Amino acid sequence: MRWRLSKPQAATSIEQSKGSFEDAIRRNLLFAQLQDLVAWGRKNSLWPYNFGLSCCYVEMVTSFTSKYDIARFGAEVIRATPREADLMVISGTVFIKMAPVIKRLYEQMMEPRWVISMGSCANSGGMYDIYSVVQGVDKFLPVDVYVPGCPPRPDAFLEGLLLLQEAIGKEQRPLSWAIGPQGVERAPKPSLRDQRRAERQKATVFRSPDEV
């Protein structure tokens, strides 16, 4: 595919096409299935809810800075209300007193909506195996992506975001109520830990934590 640049002064002049009609159509038209086009728009325009619980939230917010630039992935539009968001990142320790609030906020989010569990505390309770902490946010919320770490680096959060976008792009959701009742077909969720186990077992050079 070739593109031509012209000066602003010559914008009024129409350049004669030097290719065939098929080439002109190929440069100006895009053909796709409606379902694939909608999924492409959803995965590239996630609106996170500005919500955090504890220290992992600091790492999440760091991903919005210029160094990591989450805007590259179309997820920089932070919403201050759950009614305008479609992504909730559970970043931090989930206390039992906070669980009903989190569930209520989740219910107010737009459909379709997704959840990222960020950090060991949100994934499994972390080091707080006590009566006041929920041992995993998936006890009361459906989780789409788990990001391990205590706390995870912004790079890990961005990788989790990319995994979520990949899964959203493969989802098949109903486009109209007039077609009839339809379910949501989700892509399988592979475990990256299992996929990378063989590669990690072959590692012979181990870097210090300040070099990771």
UniProtKB/Swiss-Prot annotation:
Q: How does it sit in the membrane?
A: Peripheral membrane protein
Which keywords label this protein?
A: 4Fe-4S, Cell inner membrane, Cell membrane, Iron, Iron-sulfur, Membrane, Metal-binding, NAD, Quinone, Translocase, Transport, Ubiquinone
Q: Which InterPro entries match?
A: NADH_UbQ_OxRdtase-like_20kDa, NADH_UQ_OxRdtase_20Kd_su
Q: Where is the composition biased (Basic and acidic residues)?
A: 186-212
Which reaction does this enzyme catalyse, per its entry?
a quinone + NADH + 5 H(+)(in) = a quinol + NAD(+) + 4 H(+)(out)
Q: Which cofactor does it need?
A: [4Fe-4S] cluster
The segment annotated Disordered runs over 179-212
Its EC top class is: translocase
Q: What is its main location?
A: membrane
| Family classification | Belongs to the complex I 20 kDa subunit family.
Q: Tell me, what does this protein do in biology?
A: NDH-1 shuttles electrons from NADH, via FMN and iron-sulfur (Fe-S) centers, to quinones in the respiratory chain. The immediate electron acceptor for the enzyme in this species is believed to be ubiquinone. Couples the redox reaction to proton translocation (for every two electrons transferred, four hydrogen ions are translocated across the cytoplasmic membrane), and thus conserves the redox energy in a proton gradient.
Q: What is this protein called?
A: NADH-quinone oxidoreductase subunit B 1
Gene name as annotated: nuoB1
